A protein has these predicted regions:
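A non-catalytic alpha/beta surface segment that caps or lines the substrate-entry region
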Residues: 9-10, 29-53, 58-134
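Solvent-exposed loop/turn segments at secondary-structure junctions
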Residues: 114-117, 133-135, 145-149, 205-210, ...
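Structural recognition of the beta-strand scaffold that forms the well-ordered cores
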Residues: 128-130, 138-142, 199-202, 247-253, ...
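Extracytoplasmic/secreted proteins, especially bacterial periplasmic and envelope-associated proteins
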Residues: 69-76, 86, 90-103, 167, ...
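Acidic/histidine-rich catalytic neighborhood of metal-dependent amide-processing enzymes
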Residues: 157-275
Length: 365
């Protein structure tokens, strides 16, 4: 009996040890799984850019073409395009057609919805172009494609919102074109980062119809932020959503006038603002910026102010924002003079180069 007793205890001890081992392994696997699921949403905070060489920067400057952008991308947008108008539809078709013509293989979607305005229900359509929808993380560049409704003018003129925001739309289209071969490598190169991609968002309904208020403004961004917050990402996920996939939300607005100054609005994205400053200095030092007398002409200083714009619905949900809007605003803001004649092509060309270098560095391309 004694021998059998020792055998039973040994067996019991073995079983208990095995059970504890299995429990430990299982718990470890579950914990590791949860951490793996959660960790990718934290990678944005430690993400580091790959700084381009002088040769890489010169290649960017050589590939971008502001005259081509002006003719092919900007001119078709310089029309009246308030939500629901024929011009709004034409501009959306133009944006989609330009992106779909590229080799990188963008996935283009429209987020169409009905929103209540002071003039009753109107239809709005955001455009979301994603380079690699299966990537967990997205660098987002955004602007609004609609124009403010100013009504008929006695001289027959219409408001075309050149800086607000036809030029930012054209800048994103030119970026996608100029960097097409580089962006294509995200999908095809084994050295690319499959978990990091680029997304371009063109919002509808940024402008107020009557007077800016929480309910009469930001129609498209309010709708899309809410939709992304309730959409699982990656597909099938149970505890992460599309909003969490946004590494950095870069919003362009009121760009195109001469001598803009862009302050840093948010301390938590200061390191990315600092990269823009560094890129501007480097391009200046290489003599690749036109009519640019100072190495820190565009991106300078901090501000305590907060400007209401399409980033607000995302900011309130915890998304990191880099807001590229000049302060002070262009003198032509919300006037009929916000037209092509008051744009400054060398400034737009310079900002194209800075933004394109920034994107390549962020995406480690």
């Amino acid at each position: 009996m004694a021998g059998g007793n020792r055998g039973n205890k040994a067996a019991a001890s073995f079983c208990l040890t095995g059970a504890l081992y299995l429990a430990t392994v299982t718990f470890s696997q579950l914990t590791d799984g949860r951490e793996a699921r959660a960790n990718w949403t934290q990678e944005k905070y430690s993400h580091q850019p790959t700084i381009l060489t002088f040769a890489g920067i010169q290649q960017v400057a050589a590939c971008t073409d502001v005259s081509q952008m002006w003719q092919n991308d900007l001119h078709p947008i310089l029309i009246e395009r308030y939500p629901g108008s024929p011009g709004n539809y034409a501009v959306r078709q133009h944006i989609k057609r330009r992106i779909q013509s590229l080799q990188a293989g963008w996935v283009v979607e429209e987020d169409t919805f009905q929103g209540y305005t002071p003039y009753g229900y109107r239809t709005f359509s955001n455009i979301i172009s994603t380079l690699n929808p299966s990537a967990k993380r997205q660098l987002v560049l955004a602007c609004h494609h609609d124009s403010k409704y100013l009504g008929p003018q006695w001289d027959g003129r219409v408001f075309v919102g050149a800086t607000d925001s036809a030029v930012p739309c054209a800048m994103l289209l030119e970026l996608a074109r100029a960097l097409d071969s580089k962006l294509q490598s995200i999908k095809t190169s084994s050295a690319s980062r499959p978990d990091l991609s680029l997304q371009l968002i063109f919002f509808d309904g940024e402008e107020a119809f009557v007077r800016w208020s929480p309910t009469d403004s930001l129609y498209g961004s309010r709708h899309l932020a809410q939709k992304m917050a309730s959409t699982p990402h990656p597909p099938g996920a149970t505890n992460t959503n599309q909003l969490q996939s946004i590494d950095l939300f870069v919003l362009l607005d009121l760009i195109g006038a001469s001598n803009p100054t862009f302050p840093n609005y948010f301390s938590n994205t200061a390191r990315w603002f600092n990269r823009l400053q560094a890129i501007e200095r480097k391009l200046h030092g290489l003599g690749l910026l036109k009519n640019h007398p100072s190495e820190r002409q565009y991106f300078q200083g901090n501000t305590q102010g907060l400007i209401e714009d399409d980033h607000i619905p995302f900011l309130r949900r915890g998304v990191q924002v880099l807001h590229l809007i000049p302060s002070p605003f262009p003198k032509v803001w919300h006037t009929m003079e916000d037209n092509e004649q008051n744009l400054n092509k060398p400034t737009v060309d310079n900002l194209n180069k800075i933004l394109q270098v920034f994107v390549l560095e962020y995406l480690n391309l």
